[in-house]
Amino acid sequence: MSQKTVKVQLVRSLIGTREDHRATVRGLGLRRINSVSELQDTPAVRGMINKVSYLVKVLA
Protein backbone atom coordinates (compact mmCIF):
# COMPACT_ATOMS: atom_id res chain seq x y z
CA MET A 1 0.00 0.00 0.00
CA SER A 2 1.51 3.30 -1.06
CA GLN A 3 1.44 6.40 1.12
CA LYS A 4 -0.89 9.16 0.03
CA THR A 5 0.82 12.49 -0.50
CA VAL A 6 -0.25 16.09 -0.76
CA LYS A 7 1.56 18.90 -2.60
CA VAL A 8 1.52 22.34 -1.03
CA GLN A 9 2.63 25.64 -2.61
CA LEU A 10 3.40 28.89 -0.77
CA VAL A 11 1.44 31.62 -2.57
CA ARG A 12 1.68 34.60 -0.19
CA SER A 13 4.55 36.36 1.55
CA LEU A 14 5.32 35.66 5.20
CA ILE A 15 6.00 39.35 5.90
CA GLY A 16 3.63 40.60 8.57
CA THR A 17 2.39 37.16 9.57
CA ARG A 18 2.44 35.71 13.06
CA GLU A 19 5.63 33.99 14.21
CA ASP A 20 3.90 30.66 14.82
CA HIS A 21 2.44 30.76 11.30
CA ARG A 22 5.92 31.36 9.88
CA ALA A 23 7.19 28.39 11.86
CA THR A 24 4.33 26.25 10.54
CA VAL A 25 5.16 27.18 6.94
CA ARG A 26 8.81 26.26 7.56
CA GLY A 27 7.62 22.98 9.09
CA LEU A 28 5.80 22.26 5.85
CA GLY A 29 9.14 22.61 4.04
CA LEU A 30 8.29 25.86 2.24
CA ARG A 31 10.85 28.66 1.92
CA ARG A 32 10.05 31.07 -0.91
CA ILE A 33 6.89 32.15 -2.66
CA ASN A 34 5.87 29.52 -5.24
CA SER A 35 8.01 26.84 -3.59
CA VAL A 36 6.33 23.43 -3.58
CA SER A 37 6.64 20.68 -1.02
CA GLU A 38 5.29 17.13 -1.25
CA LEU A 39 4.30 15.69 2.12
CA GLN A 40 2.60 12.59 3.46
CA ASP A 41 -1.13 13.07 3.89
CA THR A 42 -1.46 12.75 7.67
CA PRO A 43 -3.80 14.45 10.16
CA ALA A 44 -0.86 16.48 11.51
CA VAL A 45 0.04 17.81 8.06
CA ARG A 46 -3.62 18.53 7.32
CA GLY A 47 -3.82 20.56 10.53
CA MET A 48 -0.71 22.55 9.59
CA ILE A 49 -2.16 23.29 6.15
CA ASN A 50 -5.46 24.35 7.72
CA LYS A 51 -3.67 26.70 10.12
CA VAL A 52 -1.92 28.61 7.31
CA SER A 53 -4.56 28.10 4.60
CA TYR A 54 -4.48 31.82 3.75
CA LEU A 55 -0.79 31.50 2.77
CA VAL A 56 -0.71 28.19 0.89
CA LYS A 57 -2.46 26.37 -1.94
CA VAL A 58 -2.97 22.60 -2.08
CA LEU A 59 -2.01 21.28 -5.51
CA ALA A 60 -2.72 17.56 -5.20
Swiss-Prot record:
Record keywords: Ribonucleoprotein, Ribosomal protein
One GO CC term, this protein: cytosolic large ribosomal subunit
Molecular function in Gene Ontology: structural constituent of ribosome
Gene3D superfamilies for this protein: Ribosomal protein L30, ferredoxin-like fold domain
Pfam family of the protein (one): Ribosomal_L30
Keyword tRNA-binding among UniProt keywords: no
Family of the protein in this entry: Belongs to the universal ribosomal protein uL30 family.
Complexes and interactors: Part of the 50S ribosomal subunit.
Name of the molecule in the record: Large ribosomal subunit protein uL30
Organism annotation: Cupriavidus necator (strain ATCC 17699 / DSM 428 / KCTC 22496 / NCIMB 10442 / H16 / Stanier 337)
Biological classification of the source: Bacteria, Pseudomonadati, Pseudomonadota, Betaproteobacteria, Burkholderiales
